[in-house]
């Protein structure tokens, strides 16, 4: 093992529990892919890392859906759990245990924690008034009440907020309220509820939220909530309800959000019982193990306020860290069924390779909570350029010569210094993975891939192969290149597990991060088979078509404005005028904001024989981190221009009307910095 991984760590990792009431979609998958990559990395480094999850299987919504389908809630959640597991497996998400909150273990821990809170005098009871459906004989949550918005008078709005004007209100303020379950007019009715005395944990939470367990942005947000004052948390619901009944409280059930995070304990306990793992070692108060929760930023309050308080009061350890991520947009907009961008996991798998999405998400993920845009044009371009055009290309250009000319046997490594750079880069890449800065890791890996491709381009094995007496040189070139490829695939293995497995088989060698310095020499390999195909935009279009739901035109609504006319073609020029323009392929080495500039980004461009500094008016459409490592096209012989912010030494090519609709041009895969655009 390397120095960085000598100390074996015991790590438990969870993702938020998907609700057992519907399918997995691409917005969900960001989190599970992010978590799976991190867990696979930890295991590659030799750590003892477990990944558990479960379906969140309780609540009114599940009870009502099962009723509509004429089945029991148990039958519904069993079916949905099977569907979820199949979807996750399709994306190579590898859980050590995938369980359900509707389990004996979860009931035990829910009751145990509740009794501890009660014994510590942190449970209160009091009567509250709620809307009640007289036909279904059930209390109604805000989302099960509809009526007319009291502010804008839009009909058919939910009981807590208006989707038309954004107003928030109480169900009692709705005009003409009705039950969304039966259609009956609800009545107000009193009921005794159980509350967790969260305000009594203010001092504990003030310290814990600043202990390093949260990202700075999250800790700052929670500080605002703590300053505003915490409220007691209603942890009970009235029958009928699908869930666990509260001990000694007939007809009262634990609210789904009480037993959902407890599902982490239950799923891990189930794994421990099956595999003989010491549960207490991970969850006792003074545990030396590490526990990490990956979640979406919309459920921070449950995981960073309620959950640590419950654990602390019940005698368990608190999480080492809770890491939140942002939401997914598609093509710059909220996922939409009418546009076909509300894409289900199964629909994606029917059309595209899951490792495309794993790589694209990894290439854009940071350790922060910013939202992520899945731009489908960029998705295709990046996968084709990075994975097919760079990484796989190295093996496909080298392996054939080894198989045909040298009976599948590698020779001696002759580029030790170059390979040392690849080996040494593993520690920096490991640091990026550890910090969940996957985008930075991918950019560093692609920098190495560029070096490997440039090496093959410079050495030209296809030319050497035709020369007499150059067999040793040809074998050495291909041996060097395939060792570079092996190191790249080692670093990409957490992101591309299936491709990594195929690479291991082809190379007859395990991809071992900690022993990566052991190079392949005089070693037999198998015949190379294509590892990955290019993304075809036609496949993406078919996926979007399959995801679309026809939306009827709203009565009385004006039709959308017609698309603006395209800008007319400019007047003709003579060819000699055009020939004066020197267009070159350029790699964006660095991209950064320009202080004081609203529209500009500063780009450092590698054009093969030096770097150029260019100011580009593309800030409205691109984040700097999304540009670094990409290939583009620039006007290389444009006279440098002095600007307020510095000297601009060229111009990158982009299309679009402006604003968010600016699209920088990218060359096809295989193009390298400095190539002239013909």
From Swiss-Prot:
Classification via InterPro entries: aa-tRNA-synth_I_CS, Anticodon_Met, Met-tRNA-synth_bsu_C, Met-tRNA_ligase_1, Met-tRNA_synth, Methionyl/Leucyl_tRNA_Synth, MetRS_core, MetRS_Zn
GO biological process: methionyl-tRNA aminoacylation
Location of the protein in the cell: Cytoplasm
Assigned GO CC terms: cytosol
Keyword Nucleotidyltransferase applies: no
Domain tRNA-binding span(s) in chain numbering: 577-678
Gene3D superfamilies to which the protein is assigned, alphabetical: HUPs, Isoleucyl-tRNA Synthetase, Domain 1, Methionyl-tRNA synthetase, Zn-domain, Nucleic acid-binding proteins
Annotated binding of ATP, by residue: 337
Required co-factors: Zn(2+)
Short motif 'HIGH' region, span: 18-28
TM segment ranges: none
Keywords for the protein's UniProt record, in alphabetical order: Aminoacyl-tRNA synthetase, ATP-binding, Cytoplasm, Ligase, Metal-binding, Nucleotide-binding, Protein biosynthesis, RNA-binding, tRNA-binding, Zinc
Cofactor binding, per record: Binds 1 zinc ion per subunit.
Disulfide partners: none
EC number(s) stated in the UniProt entry for this protein: 6.1.1.10
Reactions accelerated catalytically: tRNA(Met) + L-methionine + ATP = L-methionyl-tRNA(Met) + AMP + diphosphate
Span(s) of short sequence motif 'KMSKS' region: 334-338
CDD domains on file: Anticodon_Ia_Met, MetRS_core, tRNA_bind_EcMetRS_like
UniProt GO molecular function: ATP binding; metal ion binding; methionine-tRNA ligase activity; tRNA binding
Pfam families in alphabetical order: Anticodon_3 (PF19303), tRNA-synt_1g (PF09334), tRNA_bind (PF01588)
Binding residues for Zn(2+): 149, 152, 162, 165
Its job: Is required not only for elongation of protein synthesis but also for the initiation of all mRNA translation through initiator tRNA(fMet) aminoacylation.
Family per similarity comment: Belongs to the class-I aminoacyl-tRNA synthetase family. MetG type 1 subfamily.
Quaternary structure (record): Homodimer.
Full protein name: Methionine--tRNA ligase
């Amino acid at each position: 093992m390397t120095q960085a991984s000598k100390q074996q760590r015991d790590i438990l990792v969870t993702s938020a529990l998907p609700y057992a009431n519907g399918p997995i979609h691409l917005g969900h998958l960001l989190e599970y892919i992010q978590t799976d990559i991190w867990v696979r990395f930890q295991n590659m480094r030799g750590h003892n890392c477990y990944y558990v999850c479960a379906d969140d299987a309780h609540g009114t919504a599940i009870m009502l859906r099962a009723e509509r389908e004429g089945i029991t809630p148990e039958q519904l959640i069993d079916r949905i759990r099977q569907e979820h597991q199949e979807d996750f497996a399709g994306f190579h998400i590898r859980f050590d245990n995938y369980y359900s909150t509707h389990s004996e273990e979860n009931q035990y821990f829910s009751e145990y924690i509740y009794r501890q809170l009660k014994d510590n005098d942190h449970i209160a009871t009091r009567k509250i008034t709620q809307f009640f459906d007289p036909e279904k004989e059930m209390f109604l949550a805000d989302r099960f009440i509809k009526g007319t918005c009291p502010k804008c008078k839009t009909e058919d709005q939910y009981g807590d907020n208006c989707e038309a004007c954004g107003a928030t209100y109480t169900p009692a303020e709705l005009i003409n309220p009705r039950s969304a379950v039966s259609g009956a007019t609800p009545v107000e009715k009193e009921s005794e509820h159980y509350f967790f005395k969260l305000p009594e944990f203010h001092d504990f939470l003030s310290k814990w939220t600043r202990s390093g367990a949260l990202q700075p942005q999250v800790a700052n947000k929670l500080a605002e909530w703590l300053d505003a004052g915490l409220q007691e948390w209603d942890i009970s619901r009235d029958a009928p309800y699908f869930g666990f009944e509260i001990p000694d409280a007939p007809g009262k059930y634990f609210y789904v959000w009480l037993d959902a995070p407890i599902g982490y304990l239950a799923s891990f306990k189930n794994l421990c019982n099956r595999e003989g793992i010491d549960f207490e070692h991970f969850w006792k108060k003074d545990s030396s193990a590490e526990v990490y929760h990956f979640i979406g930023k919309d459920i921070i309050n449950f995981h960073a306020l309620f959950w640590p308080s419950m654990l602390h009061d019940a005698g368990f350890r608190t999480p080492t860290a809770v890491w939140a991520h942002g939401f997914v947009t598609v093509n710059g907009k909220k996922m939409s069924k009418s546009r076909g961008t509300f894409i289900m996991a199964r629909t994606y798998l029917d059309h595209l390779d899951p490792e495309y999405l794993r790589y694209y998400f990894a290439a854009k993920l940071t350790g922060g909570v910013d939202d992520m845009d899945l731009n489908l044009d960029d998705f295709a371009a990046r996968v084709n350029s990075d994975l097919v055009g760079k990484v796989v290309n190295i093996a496909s250009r080298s392996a054939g010569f080894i198989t045909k000319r040298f009976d599948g046997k590698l020779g001696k490594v002759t580029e030790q210094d170059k390979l040392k750079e690849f080996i040494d880069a593993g520690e920096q890449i490991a640091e990026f993975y550890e910090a969940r800065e996957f985008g930075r890791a991918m950019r560093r890996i692609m920098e190495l891939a560029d070096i490997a491709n440039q090496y093959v381009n410079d050495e030209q094995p296809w030319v050497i192969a035709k020369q007499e007496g150059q067999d040793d040189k040809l074998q050495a070139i291909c041996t060097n290149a395939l060792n570079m490829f092996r190191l790249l695939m080692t670093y990409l293995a957490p992101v591309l597990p299936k491709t990594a497995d195929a690479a291991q088989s082809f190379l007859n060698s395990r991809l071992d991060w900690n022993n990566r310095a052991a190079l392949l020499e005089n070693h037999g390999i198998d015949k190379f088979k294509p590892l990955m195909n290019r993304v075809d935009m036609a496949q993406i279009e078919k996926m979007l078509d399959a995801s679309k739901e026809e939306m009827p035109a709203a009565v009385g609504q004006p039709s959308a404005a017609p698309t603006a006319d395209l800008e007319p073609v400019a007047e003709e020029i003579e060819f000699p005028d055009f020939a004066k323009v020197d267009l070159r392929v350029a790699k964006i080495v660095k991209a950064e904001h320009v202080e004081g500039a609203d529209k500009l980004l500063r780009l450092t461009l590698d054009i093969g024989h030096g770097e150029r500094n260019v100011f580009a008016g593309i800030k409205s459409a691109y984040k700097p981190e999304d540009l670094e490592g990409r290939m583009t096209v620039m006007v290389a012989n444009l006279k440098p221009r002095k600007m307020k912010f510095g000297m601009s030494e060229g111009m990158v090519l982009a299309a679009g009307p402006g604003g968010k609709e600016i699209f920088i041009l990218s060359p096809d895969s295989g193009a390298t910095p400095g190539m002239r655009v013909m």
